[in-house]
Amino acid sequence: MMFEYEEDEDPMEQQKHEEFKHHSTDHSGSPQENPFRFSYDTGKRAASMFVTPSSEDLIAYGTKHLLDSPTAVQRSLVLNATTSLNIDCDLSSDDDLSPTTQRKICFCASQNPAETQEQGLRPAKSTLAISFPCHQHQITEDYTISAEIIGIGESGKVMACYQKVTGEKFALKVLRDSQKARREVELHWLTNAHENVVSILDIYENTFDNVKCLLMVVEFLEGGDLLSQFESQGSIPYTEKKVGEIIRQIGNAVMYLHDMNIAHRDIKLENILCSGTGDNCVYKLGDYGFAKRPERNVLMESPCCTPFYAPPEVLGRERYDKSCDMWSLGVAMYILLCGYPPFYSMKGVALSPGMRSRIANAYYAFPHEEWDCVSKDTKDDIRCLLRTNPSDRLTIHELMATPLVTGEPIVPGKHITTAIAIPGADESECGGGVFDDGFIVEEEETPDTVAEILPVPKSVRFLRDGVKAPRLHSIQEEVGRAMEIMRMGTDQVYIKNPTASCNNLFERRRAVHLSIPRVYC
């Protein structure tokens, strides 16, 4: 993914920052110490706090002295910690902010974002109200802030902090105060009591360098995020039992959110945090940067998502509901069971037109090399989650009742069974028994997905001794799917001009063709 940063700052805003460069004040006007000060000599700490100089003094000292001062470094750190990150894939982060505003770093908290068309149709909202418990005193009175960056969320950086009384380590998320930031904190606070949601310890409202910030202290999970764990062990697919346990825990959190009419809208492996790495690991849902709680029976329309996990209705900029989370859960299950995503970009960008088309039409498959060991029940669960029609997808309550999540044994003969006859191959090679007719289907497959196994014509069934049918099917499946994609998105098929293609084979054939005179009968 690519992130855009805007380095230029308005001259008037820059002058305003310079006037507050060494000091900040709270609501009562009393001076505050910036908690993001990391001086090497604690003995000089008191000397570093001084009265804000006048504009004339600033001009006299010059810009160079200001840039070299410790407070300039602190100010840069706190502003960087509240930097808004934007995915460069033509997707806005929320309906409360315009796309132009999202692509810029806001250097002044008092700067108002441009009004979007959707905001213009709604009545103006009143002053932001605090709907969650919030401390007004300085966070440095209770915690020691570390320069360690734990991670980067959708709306800001996550830093390490330590409680002064106990020395216990926590995670600190710094958010520039805004309507969107307050909604994130509010929704996280409403659900943080759940055992599978990252819990909140304290919330502070502080002002640093005239920038009003919300600081959220949350529990620190030693295991990190699930994607990092998965990649650290080589992206080796998890067993169905382990995936079922992960989905059971995260599904409990999602069910808790959905019952409160809250859509997370950014479920992905990076936002699933782990208490450890062992079998007794507790998985928790975090990062509410995209979360939203619409009114009952009101659909959402802002395209908030991560491309790999985005459902068709979100990419198509249609109205959608909480079922978008179910699609994302299906993608997460797919990745954990095979090691790669069902939808991918072939051009090195976050969301290519071809990937968008594959998502919109649910073009994916279960290659035999990785999926032969996965049960039909689990594959069908993924099919039911990755349905293009949101109303046809499994709900979170239905998913929690599946054998994968409950751990119940699979009922024989309930799902599709297939088998191919290959002489000299035992049942373990074919994945089933041997039949003379070569292809048996006991039940129809999900209609809106690519067929898992295609019938093999007799003309190519026995190309050579010892060939394995699953691999043969996989090749045919890939070719067929590629042809379907070409027919579906013809604008992505580029035909070069033969005279300008610089193709060596074409040039040789053209030279031979020109050197041999044509004979007409």
UniProtKB/Swiss-Prot annotation:
Provide the GO biological process annotations.
adult locomotory behavior; behavioral response to nicotine; intracellular signal transduction; protein autophosphorylation; protein phosphorylation
- What segment(s) does the record annotate as region Disordered? 1-36
Q: Please report the stretch or stretches of sequence annotated as the Protein kinase domain.
A: 144-405
Q: Which InterPro entries match?
A: Kinase-like_dom_sf, MAPKAPK_C, Prot_kinase_dom, Protein_kinase_ATP_BS, Ser/Thr_kinase_AS
Where's the active site on this chain? D266 (proton acceptor)
Tissue-specific expression? Expressed in body wall muscles (at protein level). Expressed in intestine.
Cellular location(s): Cytoplasm, Myofibril, Sarcomere; Cytoplasm, Myofibril, Sarcomere, A band
Q: What is its main location?
A: cytoplasm
Q: Name one GO cellular component term.
A: A band
Q: Where does ATP bind?
A: I150, G151, I152, G153, E154, S155, G156, K157, V158, K173
Q: Which UniProt keywords apply?
A: ATP-binding, Cytoplasm, Kinase, Magnesium, Metal-binding, Nucleotide-binding, Phosphoprotein, Serine/threonine-protein kinase, Transferase
Q: How is it modified after translation?
A: Autophosphorylated in vitro.
| GO MF terms held by the record | ATP binding; calcium-dependent protein serine/threonine kinase activity; calcium/calmodulin-dependent protein kinase activity; calmodulin binding; metal ion binding; mitogen-activated protein kinase binding; protein kinase activity; protein kinase binding
Q: Where does the record place Basic and acidic residues bias?
A: 13-26
Similarity annotation? Belongs to the protein kinase superfamily. CAMK Ser/Thr protein kinase family.
Q: What does this protein do?
A: Serine/threonine-protein kinase which may play a role in body wall muscle contraction. May phosphorylate unc-22/twitchin.
Kindly provide the name given to this protein in its UniProt entry: MAP kinase-activated protein kinase mak-1
Q: Which organism is it from?
A: Caenorhabditis elegans
